[in-house]
Amino acid sequence: MSHTEVKLKVPFGNKLLDAVCLVPNKSLTYGVILTHGASGDMNLPHLTSLASHLASHGFFCLRFTCKGLNIVHRIKAYKSVLNYLKTSEYKLAGVFLGGRSMGSRAAASVLCHIEPDDADDFVRGLICISYPLHHPKQQHKLRDEDLFRIKDPVLFVSGSADEMCEKNLLEKVAQKMQAPHKIHWIEKANHSMAVKGRSTNDVFKEINTQILFWIQEITETDKK
């Protein structure tokens, strides 16, 4: 399915966030918000590949840049993007919040802090690519508090050799979550999703396929 790229500026306090939308050439229903990790920007290959894949299957996709290591700042920026889409001209029925590494932490925090009065079903789920559950070699300090408060569906896509998300620890955290959840492991992938002996595009294809399938499952259920 063809789509159109639209560059825009999203209001964030007295600043503007750089963003790019991929808009499918069809009537819109659902969208996905994506942002990068502690480094990089919205043009990270992981994100551009995923956005193109989702848009080619009919899902509106917005990527945005918010640089910096201050997680509170990143969370506020993400919330501004979400609020922008709620009232935008695209008139989406719902969105999925997503991100890579630190970006997925910000998305998770936004979702778990949505006020009851805002629970209008606009946010349909959370996509965590390489969720940074802990610092390398600091498995005793888990970033799991927000995950336990989420009630909407969550998809984790992580590498089985991720130095910031030990496999058995994420599985234990997931078992305690109240939200419906799924974990897809990219075998032998590290935090950057690099796998020795596999091409980057091959890994991207696996990630993109899993995320699209999960989103389609939820949106198809909504139609019933």
Curated annotation (Swiss-Prot):
InterPro entries: AB_hydrolase_fold, KANL3/Tex30_Abhydrolase, NSL3/Tex30. It comes from the Eukaryota. Gene3D superfamilies: alpha/beta hydrolase. Signal peptide: none annotated. This is Testis-expressed protein 30. The lineage of its organism: Eukaryota, Metazoa, Chordata, Craniata, Vertebrata.
